[in-house]
Amino acid sequence: MMKHVKGMDGVFIMRDSLVTVNLTPGVRVYGEKLIEWGGSEYRVWDPRRSKMAAAVLNGLRGFQLNPESRVLYLGASAGTTASHISDIVTMGRVYCVEFSPRMMRELIEVCRVRGNMVPLLEDASRPLDYMRMVENADLVYCDVAQPDQTGLFIRNMDCFLKDDGYGLIMVKARSIDVTRSPRKIFREEAGKLRDSGFRIIDQVGLKPYEKDHMAILVQRSV
């Protein structure tokens, strides 16, 4: 039994697992399971390796990704989640911003076989540095474990997000302040987004896959 995930082309729930249609059949990115079904190959999207997968499995809805979407990914690391987004936006682009040279080396290897992924060795807190290399985005996705993660997310949305686009941030409370209640931190970060002209579309916690994380989906206020 296969169920399509609303709003996300090529994403399904199969046998209680989240899967994407493999853009590069036969090729794994992080040792994920491959499933052949109905003449297509699917990659299991592991929610313990991908916060976006965890958010979707926990019920996050309200944004659209289609084959022509352009995505700006802040904190792409070695490309685990970005590769699944690449499966979805087959004719679009995934601009992968990563600051760590070590992670970038691994990310480049993923990008070599996925022509719609663009690796950028840049600091996500300085969007003007890569402004000429990135097109306007349908989705700005942020998974950066820094105290100012919401601030840099907002700056990137101000630079790159289309008027009708979406922003999705994985707020890590312990990276902001280990001494305070995660619930209070999540409320404050959501407030920063509202104060900057964005409305909250949806938000979900990431338990049991991640502790003290909250996925917050936003869009520009009308």
Swiss-Prot record:
Function recorded in the entry: Involved in pre-rRNA and tRNA processing. Utilizes the methyl donor S-adenosyl-L-methionine to catalyze the site-specific 2'-hydroxyl methylation of ribose moieties in rRNA and tRNA. Site specificity is provided by a guide RNA that base pairs with the substrate. Methylation occurs at a characteristic distance from the sequence involved in base pairing with the guide RNA.
Swiss-Prot/TrEMBL keywords: Methyltransferase, RNA-binding, rRNA processing, Transferase, tRNA processing
Record carries keyword Calcium: no
Subunit structure and binding partners: Interacts with nop5. Component of box C/D small ribonucleoprotein (sRNP) particles that contain rpl7ae, FlpA and nop5, plus a guide RNA.
One Pfam family recorded for the sequence: Fibrillarin
SUPFAM superfamilies in alphabetical order: S-adenosyl-L-methionine-dependent methyltransferases (SSF53335)
Family assignment from sequence similarity: Belongs to the methyltransferase superfamily. Fibrillarin family.
MF (Gene Ontology): histone H2AQ104 methyltransferase activity; RNA binding; rRNA methyltransferase activity
Top-level taxonomic group: Viruses
InterPro entries in the cross-refs: Fibrillarin, Fibrillarin_CS, SAM-dependent_MTases_sf
Family annotation (PANTHER family): FIBRILLARIN, RRNA 2-O-METHYLTRANSFERASE FIBRILLARIN
NCBIfam families: PRK04266.1-2
Native species: Methanothermobacter phage psiM100
EC identifiers of the protein: 2.1.1.-
Binding site for S-adenosyl-L-methionine: 80-81, 98-99, 123-124, 143-146
GO biological process: box C/D sno(s)RNA 3'-end processing; tRNA processing
Protein name according to UniProt: Fibrillarin-like rRNA/tRNA 2'-O-methyltransferase
